[in-house]
């Protein structure tokens, strides 16, 4: 199982004949068994938390005395107000829902079980008393009768903080949540440390709420633009590079110009007739416009410099995009692969979060310093948290690796099928079938290696965040260096893993053998890898920039109409981030296809020479691309010792549509 092999095995590997798609065998079975055992452990954690009553406490909620709302409870020893009958009290109500513990990120307000949530704001204790008499829902402590709300001297402690915000029950979780956004703004202050002025945060969140329809529309626009770009890649890949280049130039110039124009316009606008609140909003918008304009200018200059350096290599990318476009023509379901992966990730994340919430309410009841009940796990079971966190990383990486193996298997099937008319009816489903039958162990091993690197990096990032504001600058610098090194190692391993999955899809070898073979082939074709990855990835990056710029420009024009009464700094950031994520999800599949095609090509040229019986599998356009790339690099004096072998044309029947 080790990745290290003897010299004899290495020699045998170098002499081994590659037989694409011919021999299929199970790979890395012990790692599949280990992964299955790990998943059984994850299931045990979920089952344990449900069996110990955590599910009822999570869904129905419980008060500060350990009573579950909506049912009869048993008496807890030495705990006052425990063992109460809450059959008619089905909702959890917090006396002060905005009172947050900023250290432990949890509400430290007293929680009670009530019959109904106050749908309207209650400004006085008389209103609270009237609400209890009309609705039969007592909002003060169990020890205080409704008739004593306005007369008892303990009302200020045992009753909710005034004014009581209007609230509504959270669906399925029976908690009374304030409907006023100001409480959530205060909660966000615990997470957003860079905001020191409460009013700024309130204005930002109000800007998001005011512009929510525009934000939703712009997010849909980014999705439509991404799908349109994928269609363009499929059908007009030959002119796509030039279209992207021109549009990015126009988009970056236009966006930068509009930002400076809006900044100058708003700076000259009269401010004598506006209210103080509108003046503050205008100043926030003016400051944001200046930051955006300067950032856009710097980005545009850097982008132009990069395009100036790479202008001679742009033409070489056209052929590569053309071949990759053919793959999407024959395998149209590849476009939807990110949706299935995202759907699987969302399902797992929902399960993981639900189990995490179960764990947060499981354990034995313990009385804290304030006399209230907390549930804590003691003994070895308290380490289930760590097991659960490792499961989040490993299984998430496993799902992403399954996508890589599925895409690699489908593209490998396309590349090594000489007559494209003989392709399987659904190459994607055929690839999924091979993955499930043969290669789940390889995917489990590759994702585990990424997990081994990601966990230490996350631990170091947490330690680094805890050292912020401390005087030990040397320790922070060392930690930052270690984090950067682990990040680089993780990216390199991700790239190597992807190529290892491709080698496994081609020749059905285990992970270590595939990784070694892929690494050797990539090293032998280092110059070609540099050319293809640099130019191809840069053009895909331009596609992402185009989508973000287009969505951001539309957002600027739409949100500009609301500049007098809302701050659109945060809405614009949300829209641009979502646009980038959507574009990345779509174009990452295209990038993956390009990488798989290149490794297939490198293996093809290494083990075939065009002679009878050893004909090339590759597309003629791909051969022309690499040959032109090699000539261009030789002319630039960067080719080194180039391969002098002439690329021979494909055998009959190898051409693709």
UniProtKB/Swiss-Prot annotation:
Topological region Mitochondrial intermembrane:
52-212, 260-288, 337-338, 402-537, 588-653
Q: Name one Pfam family in it.
A: Choline_transpo
> What would be one Gene Ontology cellular-component term for the protein?
membrane
Per the UniProt annotation, how does pH influence activity?
Answer: Optimum pH is 8.5.
What InterPro entries does its record include? Answer: Choline_transptr-like (IPR007603)
Region annotated Disordered, chain positions: 635-657
Q: Where in the cell is it found?
A: Cell membrane; Mitochondrion outer membrane
Q: Which reaction does it catalyse?
A: choline(out) + n H(+)(in) = choline(in) + n H(+)(out); ethanolamine(out) + n H(+)(in) = ethanolamine(in) + n H(+)(out)
Q: Where does the entry say this protein is expressed, by tissue?
A: Expressed in various cells of the hematopoietic system.
Presence of the UniProt keyword Cell membrane in the record: yes
Any GO MF annotation of the entry: choline transmembrane transporter activity
Covalently attached lipid (N-myristoyl glycine), positions: 2
The entry's keywords: Antiport, Cell membrane, Lipoprotein, Membrane, Mitochondrion, Mitochondrion outer membrane, Myristate, Neurodegeneration, Phosphoprotein, Transmembrane, Transmembrane helix, Transport
Per UniProt, the ranges with Basic and acidic residues bias are: 635-648
Q: Which PANTHER family match?
A: CHOLINE TRANSPORTER-LIKE (SLC FAMILY 44), CHOLINE TRANSPORTER-LIKE PROTEIN 1
Which disease does its entry mention? Neurodegeneration, childhood-onset, with ataxia, tremor, optic atrophy, and cognitive decline: An autosomal recessive neurodegenerative disease characterized by progressive ataxia, tremor, cognitive decline, dysphagia, optic atrophy, dysarthria, as well as urinary and bowel incontinence. Brain MRI demonstrates cerebellar atrophy and leukoencephalopathy.
Protein role = Choline/H+ antiporter. Also acts as a high-affinity ethanolamine/H+ antiporter, regulating the supply of extracellular ethanolamine (Etn) for the CDP-Etn pathway, redistribute intracellular Etn and balance the CDP-Cho and CDP-Etn arms of the Kennedy pathway. Involved in membrane synthesis and myelin production.
Q: What protein am I looking at?
A: Choline transporter-like protein 1
Q: Which organism is it from?
A: Homo sapiens (Human)
């Amino acid at each position: 199982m080790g990745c290290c092999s003897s010299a004899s095995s290495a020699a045998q590997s170098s002499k081994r004949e590659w037989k694409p798609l011919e021999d299929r065998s199970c790979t890395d079975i012990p790692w599949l068994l280990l992964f299955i055992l790990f998943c059984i452990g994850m299931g045990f954690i979920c089952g344990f938390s449900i069996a110990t009553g955590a599910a009822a406490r999570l869904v129905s909620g419980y008060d500060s005395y350990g009573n579950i709302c909506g049912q009869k409870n048993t008496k807890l020893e030495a705990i006052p107000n425990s063992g109460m009958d809450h059959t008619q009290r089905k909702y959890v109500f917090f006396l002060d829902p905005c009172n947050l513990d900023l250290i432990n990120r949890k509400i430290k307000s007293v929680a009670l079980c009530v019959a109904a949530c106050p749908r309207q704001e209650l400004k006085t204790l008389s209103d609270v008393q009237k609400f209890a008499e009309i609705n039969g829902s007592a909002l003060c402590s169990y020890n205080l009768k409704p008739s004593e709300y306005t007369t008892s001297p303990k009302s200020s402690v045992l009753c909710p903080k005034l004014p009581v915000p209007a609230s509504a029950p959270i669906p399925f979780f029976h908690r009374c949540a304030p409907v006023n956004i100001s409480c959530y703004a205060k909660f966000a202050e615990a997470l957003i440390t860079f905001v020191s002025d409460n009013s700024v945060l309130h204005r930002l969140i109000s800007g998001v709420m005011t512009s929510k329809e525009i934000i939703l529309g712009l997010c849909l626009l980014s999705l439509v633009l991404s799908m349109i770009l994928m269609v363009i890649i499929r059908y007009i890949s030959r002119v796509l590079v030039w279209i992207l280049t021109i549009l990015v130039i126009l988009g970056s110039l236009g966006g930068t110009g509009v930002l400076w124009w809006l900044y100058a316009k708003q700076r000259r606008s009269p401010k004598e007739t506006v209210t103080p609140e509108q003046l503050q909003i205008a100043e926030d918008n003016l400051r944001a416009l200046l930051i955006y304009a300067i950032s856009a200018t710097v980005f545009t200059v850097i982008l132009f410099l990069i395009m100036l350096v790479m202008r001679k290599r742009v033409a070489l990318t056209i052929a590569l995009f053309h071949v990759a476009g053919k793959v999407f023509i024959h395998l149209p379901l590849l476009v939807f692969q990110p949706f299935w992966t995202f759907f699987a990730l969302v399902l797992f994340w929902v399960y993981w979060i639900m189990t995490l919430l179960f764990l947060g309410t499981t354990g034995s009841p313990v009385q804290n310093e304030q006399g209230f009940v907390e549930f804590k796990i003691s003994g070895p079971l308290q380490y289930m948290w760590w097991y659960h966190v490792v499961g989040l990383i490993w299984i998430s990486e496993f799902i992403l690796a399954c996508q890589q193996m599925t895409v690699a298997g489908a593209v490998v099937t396309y590349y090594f099928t000489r007559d494209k008319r003989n392709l399987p009816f659904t190459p994607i489903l055929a690839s999924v079938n091979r993955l499930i039958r043969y290669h789940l162990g390889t995917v489990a091993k590759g994702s585990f290696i990424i997990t081994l690197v990601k966990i230490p990096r996350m631990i170091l990032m947490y330690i680094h965040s805890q050292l912020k504001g401390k005087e030990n600058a040397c320790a922070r610098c060392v930690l930052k260096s270690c984090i950067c090194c682990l990040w680089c190692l993780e990216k390199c391993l991700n790239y190597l893993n992807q190529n290892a999955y491709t080698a496994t899809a081609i020749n059905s070898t285990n992970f270590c053998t595939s990784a070694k073979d892929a690494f050797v082939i990539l090293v032998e074709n280092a110059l070609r890898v540099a050319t293809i990855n640099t130019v191809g990835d840069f053009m895909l990056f331009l596609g992402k920039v185009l989508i973000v710029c287009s969505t951001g420009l539309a957002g600027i024009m739409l949100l500009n109409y609301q500049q007098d009464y809302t701050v659109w700094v945060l809405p614009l950031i949300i829209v641009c981030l979502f646009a980038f994520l959507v574009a990345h999800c779509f174009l990452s599949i295209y990038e993956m296809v390009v990488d798989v095609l290149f490794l297939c090509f490198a293996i093809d040229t290494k083990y075939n020479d065009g002679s009878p019986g050893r004909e090339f599998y590759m597309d003629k356009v791909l051969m022309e691309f690499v040959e032109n790339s090699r000539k261009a690099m030789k002319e630039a004096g960067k080719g080194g010792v180039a391969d002098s072998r002439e690329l021979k044309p494909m055998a009959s029947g190898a051409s693709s549509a």
